[in-house]
Amino acid sequence: MTLSSPFKFLPFVLAVFFSVVLLKARGSLTVETGGASPERTLRFTVLYNNYLYEKGTKTDWGFSCLIEGAEKTILFDTGTQPQILMHNVGVLKADLKKVDQIVISHNHGDHTGGLFAALERNPNVTVFFPVSFPPEFGRRVENLKAKAQTVDKPVEICRNVYLTGEMGDAIKEQSLVIDSPKGLVIVTGCSHQGIVSILRRAKEILDKPIYLVFGGFHLGNKSDTEMQEIIAAFKELKVEKCGATHCTGDAQIAMFKKAFGENYVTMGTGRIIEVPDF
């Protein structure tokens, strides 16, 4: 049967409509690119967090994010409890067997707790962690047949994906920086060394605009005055989008949300962020 001309595009229109509905239902944020057809999409899925975004996932103190669409598939941090990490992996249909690299931001249990369970599921990975970690950590990684790689300074771990290198004094920590066509995307664990210091380090590595920063900012003890100074630094550094979560603090998250308005990205377990044209 041939459709008459007024209706011949109806199946295509309906397909697009239902695709958009499905995407919204899954809780993803897609950055519009003016109608371009992206060859590849950079995709971030929050697997572990103490805030809920997608129903059916479990919350707990900690952070983990799966990064897909780069040259390598990367798991950034692994949360606290292996069983909760694996529950959310199942609900979100994340495939840990496709992970090539695991980045551990710092040596706190709410970021390392699910690592060895993840390695048991997929040992064919390289684990990047700060050089200050105790030697036993690397030995445990290697005992599970994975490759252990310490990090002390900025390094490119795959095409367009960088680590800041170990930062901080009492608590050593690293963050992840991706050079995307929209600008730098920065993923943080807890930002013990100071979120503004991380942003500046990222700009030192790649002198490009900061498109998005998300993760834990560790600001719960900051006063309103201090927060205004931090937000002013974000604006001075021309950060376009912000997604504060995990250890940032509820009041502090509210201030970021107010300051960034529609450019604030709400975070939580099951949150999916997509950056096209990568």
Please report, for each region that a protein language model flagged, where it lies by residue:
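N-terminal secretory signal peptides that target proteins for export/translocation
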Residues: 1-5
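Zn-dependent metallo-beta-lactamase
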Residues: 7-70, 153-166, 268
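Metallo-beta-lactamase
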Residues: 29, 129-174, 180-181, 235, ...
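Conserved beta-strand hairpin/beta-sheet module of binuclear metal-dependent hydrolase folds
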Residues: 43-91, 173-188
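Active-site neighborhood of phospho(di)ester-bond hydrolases with catalytic His/Asp-centered motifs
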Residues: 75-78, 99-107, 128-131, 186-190, ...
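Active-site metal-binding motif and surrounding structural segment of the metallo-beta-lactamase
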Residues: 83-128, 203-213, 232-235
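Short, structured coil segments at secondary-structure junctions
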Residues: 92, 123, 143-144, 238, ...
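Cap/insert and terminal regions of metallo-dependent hydrolase folds
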Residues: 114-117, 184, 190-273
